[in-house]
């Protein structure tokens, strides 16, 4: 699959989707996008910048949601033009899709909406690549049904990715079953692993989600060792001050060290081949 000018797949270098959970300001958007661009160029990892103009599924109605679609898309458009990086953002309703698709390079669907048939049809038919997040409530094998819906809408175009972000495990907890990455390959789509939302503790702080940031490298290393096309990681210059998902965001100053390790694992695994394909 060609994505934003580079090839993705199990026989291609791992790529990265990264940025702050939500757009907090124009200055921070440019700071993080510029830093990530430089880091990924140095490490040798293709990069797509991610940030959201609206977080429609916050734990509390009083939590910061974002700058709104108009201001947020203006910032993403400027990041794309001035820094020369592809951009991704998520959409939460059918009505938003045309305006978002006119600006960004890749659209993303929230995990909670992965079974909404009309929504999946609309996103998939917009003409842009789509990263479909697997719901925390969904078995990995059931993503085939989601992908089938998307392909019905886009005429079978090769522009759909599927993303694992953990599975609900009791209350306020998620776990990552690494078998799901192999199972989701059966959709025929590139598989992306979300290493930061997978350590989230949904609603774990009462009016906000908690997280176990210390396990981001653990799960990221494991996923790359399994074999994935891409990684998704939310990052922030100072996660303690982040306006959304700070507890599970990976610190921007520590991103280079983590990506260097993941790059080495990815090269080793993909150079040896995947034995499970012969089992």
From Swiss-Prot:
It catalyses: D-arabinose 5-phosphate + phosphoenolpyruvate + H2O = 3-deoxy-alpha-D-manno-2-octulosonate-8-phosphate + phosphate. InterPro entries: Aldolase_TIM (IPR013785), DAHP1/KDSA (IPR006218), KDO8P_synthase (IPR006269). It is found in: Cytoplasm. Pathway: Carbohydrate biosynthesis; 3-deoxy-D-manno-octulosonate biosynthesis; 3-deoxy-D-manno-octulosonate from D-ribulose 5-phosphate: step 2/3; Bacterial outer membrane biogenesis; lipopolysaccharide biosynthesis. Disulfide bonds: none annotated. Its EC number is 2.5.1.55. GO terms for cellular component: cytoplasm. Belongs to the KdsA family. This is 2-dehydro-3-deoxyphosphooctonate aldolase. It comes from Azoarcus sp. (strain BH72).
